[in-house]
Amino acid sequence: MYRAVIFDFDGTIIDTEKHLFEIINKHLNHYGLEEVSLDFYRQSIGGLASDLHQYLEVQLGSERKEAIYQEHNETSIHLPIVTHMKQLMDYCKVSHIPMAIATSSFRNDIKPTFDQLGLDTYIDVVVGREDVEEIKPSPELYLTAVQRLNYNPVNCLAIEDSVNGATAAVNAGLDVIVNTNDMTEKQDFSNIAYVGKDLSGTAIIEKYFEKSRG
């Protein structure tokens, strides 16, 4: 049985990725500019998103680009926890299984949503962009989270939604379950050695926790 669970945040615990995509195109439409395509946006998920940031900077300028991310951070507090992740977190909480978040976002950017959802009652450790030199697909976020939980990577299960995130987890030595969303379901996971994909909270609990107890 795994002794700890490390979650990605955006697109895994809450569906912020679709939310941001819609906000970006709302702002581009407002200024009469061409929308970002879904394929282009999907390439940015789970990592640095430098191409997306550069595109928005060129099209909108720095101030208007930052307004997009400010609106995203302020309105994400209204998004619910993904049902399957809530089930898993509830199980881990009552089973005294430590939980962490390893996110390529800045901790301060996710804090309003983190606080609104009451995630402090579940999550023991949060590792963000400001805590590492390199973000996903580098394994550094996961290695840092594992270290702060004081466990070995092989004792920890990662939950991810993107290729970049899953790559980071695997390269850090963790087993990973990939639960995709509308924005990541068409990514190519064929080179990812995941242990499970698109599983319900109940299935994760039964297969990777309850069954291993027996």
Sequence positions of predicted segments:
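Short linear motifs at secondary-structure transitions and domain/linker junctions
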Residues: 18-19, 28-29, 56, 74-76, ...
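Residue-level detector of anion-binding/catalytic polar loops
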Residues: 34, 98, 175
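Non-catalytic, surface-exposed connector residues within folded enzymatic/regulatory domains
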Residues: 18, 35, 79, 104, ...
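A structural signal for short, well-ordered beta-strand elements
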Residues: 34, 45, 78, 103, ...
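Conserved phosphate-coupling serine/threonine residues in phosphotransfer and NTP-handling enzymes
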Residues: 12, 103-105
